Amino acid sequence: MLQPLFAMANTSPDQLAVPGGIVKIAVADKSQTAPTVLFNNNRVAVSKNNSHWFALVGIPLSAKAGTQQLLVNNSQKLSFTITDKDYPAQYLTIKKKRMVTGFTEQDLKKINADKIAISKAKAIWTEQAINTDFIAPVDGRLSSLFGLKRFYNNIPKRPHSGLDIAAPTGTAILAPASAIVIDTGSYYFNGNTVFLDHGQGLLSAYLHMNKITVKPGQQVKQGEPLGTVGETGRVTGPHLHWMVYLNNTPVDPALFIAKDIPRL
């Protein structure tokens, strides 16, 4: 059975305190008002559990091992420690060479415009209660893990910032939790993409889609269709690249769902 993150009673934040992971930290006791929490100048999601407030913090893949700090209500500083994690390398061959090198002027204009649109989408913050009760968004095979050091045609690129689930073109992609559609678009690298808002900076994104069946501003419930699996953008075959953001930071989506997805 899939479990919401806050229901994982046996999960210690220390076990998740790695680059690309998450930490859950008690930030206030018995206050009726939600505290304002910042990490690296980004708002952090908070949730009340048994009369205590907790912050759910996303750790950047670029974070270094050691002590980190939260700023609570612009006055109190809370420290926590993260440990290092060595993500393995992955080498992929991309047949469309212009998806890796040799971009035209028109390509670069599109890529730059996409960066602006994506940055705007993933910076969204709404005050609605955070919803971490996730299910897997597609029925498929887990084909590429989060955090891998990516090499395209032997050229080093940014680490893999999502979870790849391989499935045939046309396979339904479902909302993992109730949400509001932030935006949709067709991007150079990401292909057809949907962004969802699950509250307080918890966002999710669905890349390389074939068809998109939702519109910006639309409310979706858990299990409702967002579109279908495809192979648009920079891909090696049909799959869903699923991303989850906390405080404007990509984190491992596997932390939000059961660990028994079939793997390679």
List the predicted regions and their residue ranges.
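Zn2+-dependent peptidoglycan hydrolase active-site motif and core
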Residues: 176-210, 238, 243
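Terminal peptide-recognition signature
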Residues: 41, 70, 142, 165, ...
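Cationic-aromatic interfacial patches
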Residues: 7-88
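Short, well-structured beta-strand-loop connectors
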Residues: 172-182, 214-229
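Residue-level recognition of beta-strand microenvironments
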Residues: 145, 184-185, 209-212, 229-232
